[in-house]
Amino acid sequence: LREMHRQQQLRLIEQRISEIPADAPLIVAGDFNDWRQKADLSRSGLREVFVETHGKPARTFPARLPLLPLDRIYVRNLKVHNARVLTTRPWSHLADHVPLSVEIEL
C-alpha cells in the first residue's frame, strides 16, 4: 500500500472507533504494514501494547528474522500483561509475519 492509502485506512479505523463508547473496552490488532511507525491511534484513546510494555513496537516481519515492526495490538480501557512476540516453532513457520500475543485483563 502507498502511504496515502494507509493513512486513509487509519482514518476509517479512527472513525469506527469514534462510534464506540469511550469507556468501552476495545482491542484493535493486526497487520498495519506500518514499517514507518506512523500508525498512531492514540488520538482514539488507544495504547500500543508493545510500546507500553517494552518501549517500542514489536518486530514481526519477516518471520524467519523479524526486523520490521509491521503488526500492532492496540487497547483501550484494558490492562495488559505478558506481551510477547512468538518467534519459535510452530509460530515462526505459519505465515510471513510472526504472531503477537498478550494477556488482557478486563
Regions found by a protein language model. Give the residues of each.
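Active-site regions of metal-assisted phosphoester/phosphodiester hydrolases
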Residues: 1-106
